[in-house]
Amino acid sequence: MNYFELFSLSPSFELDTAVLSERYRELQRAVHPDKFANASEQDKRLAVQHTAQVNDGYNTLKHPISRAEHMLSLKGIDLSHESTTVKDTMFLMQQMEWREALEEISDCDDPDEAIEHLHQSFGEYRGDITAQLAQKIGSEEASVLEQAADLVRKLKFMDKLQAELERAEDALF
């Protein structure tokens, strides 16, 4: 299912989430199962299915990583069940540095500063990756789409690393 079509939106990585939310509410009102309380059983089931599709579509398009995965899947690149890893050696080295810095937070003289530094570093890197992804994901060229897929993999890693940083931060305070 093409969620962009469901929400009458142009397929774009850079999406106006306010418009998405407005369309979501409109669709929810139109297909909500309560509107079909006196309908046939088949119509009730269809309403429940449509509501589930609308909810899935909204949750997919609302988040940049899942939106990018959806855009790539529409072009034949499915990242949802893959175990492919990033092969970019510079990224892997940066990843190791970040992991070491995360492990050393509790031993730092100033854990607050270390945490702030990592937040800043993650944010800058994420911004760079997101900008590159926005440029590449609209392409129809297979090699460029593979580059976009690698960028999505990096963003997924960054999400995991961000969650680890937040857990480390919570453990300290």
Curated annotation (Swiss-Prot):
Pfam family, one: HSCB_C
GO molecular function: ATPase activator activity; protein-folding chaperone binding
Keyword Chaperone: yes
Gene coding for it: hscB
Native source species: Shewanella loihica (strain ATCC BAA-1088 / PV-4)
Source organism, top-level taxon: Bacteria
SUPFAM superfamilies reported for this sequence: Chaperone J-domain, HSC20 (HSCB), C-terminal oligomerisation domain
Highest classification ranks of the organism: Bacteria, Pseudomonadati, Pseudomonadota, Gammaproteobacteria, Alteromonadales
The protein, known as: Co-chaperone protein HscB homolog
UniProt keywords, alphabetically: Chaperone
Assembly notes: Interacts with HscA and stimulates its ATPase activity.
GO BP term, example: [2Fe-2S] cluster assembly
Domain J intervals: 2-74
